[in-house]
Amino acid sequence: MALSKDFKSYTEQVELLRTRGLYIGDPDEAEHLLASLNYYRLSGYWYPMRRFQPNGGIALDVFKAGASFELVVELYEFDERLRHCVFGGLDRVEMAVRAMIGYELGRIDPLAHLDVAYLGPRAHARSCSGPNVHEVWLGKYRAALRASREEFVTHYKKKHGSKMPIWVAVEIMDWGMLSHLYGMAPNIVRNRIAHRCGLSAPQLESWLKSLNIMRNYAAHHARMFNRVYDIKPKLNEDPRLVQVAGVMNRVFGQLSLIQYMHHQLGLSTAQRLPEVLNTFPDNDIVPLARTGAPNHWSSLVLCS
């Protein structure tokens, strides 16, 4: 199969960008950054600087006037700060969800996660004659338990056996396992946890899915600021969220979910994300509006 692109050295990559109209003040530094960050990773940041066909909307291999490699790097560095901040912010949310699930399911039974009889209707659902939802989840949980090298897991197994109470077991569950366990939980548990978050159970479940996708982007170094997010979470009637309902498919809307959870659950002062947004490089080619942030963004849920 023929390759669609020819190999180009870093020097040739710089020259290609220059011939297409991207200003590069320091070619040597540009080569160094291309070598350490990769041409196609950076291309996501200069893509909005390209000219587009008037009617078809197809991107041309020509840059807009004023486009520069330096701005590309500034946008990348902003996005890098944003990824790190998002990952840290979601870490707090994940820990809170773990604790709430462990506590509320533990109130039902210490081993509720192991016995479908203690769970809700969704746990019993099955497709055709295959395993039910809980059995599939339980297989993943047991695999995680076997693979864990955590000292507390080894200690607990030696002293008590492999059946860990839910408030211990949640510590080896990743976000996906926690989300599915929340979905399988009995309504009383789902509602208690959702109430603490100021949401209904279906709303919180949709938030957990959205935030898990965002966490995966952050963990895998994916571009965040200039992306369309496919899953739109269900919102409550909180006025702070109503004002951002129209941008839930952009990063600003997704960031608002993190901020809301931090405020609602008292996880932090919620200042880090607004501080990072304030570092967005000021320019006319790729404005902050690309994130979905309105002009009055600082008065919305991100800072309230």
Which functions belong to the PLM regions below?
Residues M1-S304:
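Long, contiguous internal "core" modules enriched in hydrophobic/ aromatic residues
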